Amino acid sequence: MQEGLYKVEFHTVHGTGNGVLYATSGKLRGGNSGFAFIGNYTRKGDEIHVKISTLRHNLDPGFKPLFGTDMITLTLKGTENGDMVDFEGTALQMPGLAFRAVLTRIGD
């Protein structure tokens, strides 16, 4: 995974969302208007493995969490395709609920 700034689009059966992530030295940091995203990534062969958590920073009830809770930890596996990375995984708190994310690199 290239270091840099990514836009992220994520999907569950409950809805979709988006935000930004910055990848550097194995760390992921970012968020959107309602939540911060804090995690780590490693490369294992052709796959990228991610563990990332959400933390609500905006108490406005208009910002609804996709998983129904303000704090969640996701475990994801992904593959690169040029400037994009496709991830699939689940939340530790809801292991049966599929999660998909597409990261697209938008800058250094």
Question: Model-predicted segments: where are they?
Answer:
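Short, compositionally biased strand/turn segments
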Residues: 14-25
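Short, solvent-exposed aromatic-acidic interface loops
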Residues: 11-13, 31-36, 53-58, 90-96
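Contiguous, well-ordered beta-strand patches that form the walls/edges
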Residues: 34-84
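Short secondary-structure capping micro-motifs at structural edges
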Residues: 24-28, 37-38
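Edge beta-strand at a domain terminus
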Residues: 18, 43-45, 84-86, 91-108
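Short hydrophobic/aromatic-rich beta-strand segments that constitute the beta-sheet cores
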Residues: 8, 28-31, 48-52, 85-89
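Tryptophan-anchored aromatic micro-motifs
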Residues: 1-14, 87-89
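Solvent-exposed residues in well-ordered beta-strands and their adjoining turns
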Residues: 9-11, 53-55, 81, 104-106
